[in-house]
């Protein structure tokens, strides 16, 4: 019986973990702020339903990352796939919103985005690592910065739906940045 421990990936995961967990947590918070901001376009009931779907999908993604068959995969690969799934979801949301579709069409993209962000966050934080003060501070600052940036882009880029699309494009970019960071850390560890 042999036991294989991939120490290189664990070291790279520690280095990437704070930035990745901050990105994985700040993007859904910014998406939630955008959903609340687009309440005038969608209606308060639809905005609250989409916000609830986002929260449930994020929690579902975090639970999915704890699933035994997925825990056997390398952590950096799971982190990358979580970010890529989230980017696909936010891009689908962006396309549906830009296409002028009503709120039920946004549901699939928001669910995929939240699911991917939940997987990425749970993978980045890890099983037993407690949040340190610096980690918490980095996460809070990132959440505020991404939320403010998304709301400023939505407000000043273009009024109405187009501003929301630009702000969602920012979230897609940040999610792809997380996937790229995971891939670079994975290549450095190999």
Where are these regions (language model features)?
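Helix-to-loop junctions at the C-terminal end of transmembrane segments
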Residues: 61-74
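Hydrophobic core of transmembrane alpha-helices in multi-pass small-molecule transporters
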Residues: 102-119
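A late C-terminal transmembrane helix in Major Facilitator Superfamily
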Residues: 133-151
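A membrane-interface helix-boundary motif in multi-pass transporters
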Residues: 103, 151-172
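Pair of pore-lining "gating" transmembrane helices in MFS-fold secondary transporters
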Residues: 8-33, 111
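Short amphipathic helix-loop junctions that connect adjacent transmembrane helices
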Residues: 27-46
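Intracellular juxtamembrane helix-capping segments at the cytosolic ends
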Residues: 117-129
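Structural signature of the two symmetry-related core transmembrane helices
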Residues: 77-91
């Amino acid at each position: 019986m042999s036991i294989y421990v991939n120490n290189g990936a664990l070291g790279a995961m520690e280095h990437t973990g704070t930035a990745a967990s901050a990105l994985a947590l700040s993007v859904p918070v910014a998406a939630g702020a955008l959903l609340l901001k687009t309440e005038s376009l969608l209606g308060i009931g639809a905005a609250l339903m989409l916000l609830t779907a986002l929260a449930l999908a994020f929690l579902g993604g975090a639970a999915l990352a704890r699933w035994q068959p997925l825990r056997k995969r390398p952590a950096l690969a799971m982190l990358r796939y979580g970010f890529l799934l989230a980017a696909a979801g936010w891009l689908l949301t962006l396309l549906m919103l830009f296409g002028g579709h009503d709120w039920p069409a946004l549901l699939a993209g928001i669910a995929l985005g939240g699911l991917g962000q939940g997987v990425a966050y749970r993978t980045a934080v890890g099983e037993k690592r407690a949040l340190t003060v610096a980690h918490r501070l980095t996460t809070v600052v990132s959440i505020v910065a991404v939320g403010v940036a998304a709301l400023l882009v939505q407000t000043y880029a273009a009024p109405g739906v187009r501003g929301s699309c630009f702000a969602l494009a920012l979230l897609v970019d940040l999610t792809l940045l997380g996937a790229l960071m995971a891939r670079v850390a994975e290549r450095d560890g190999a």
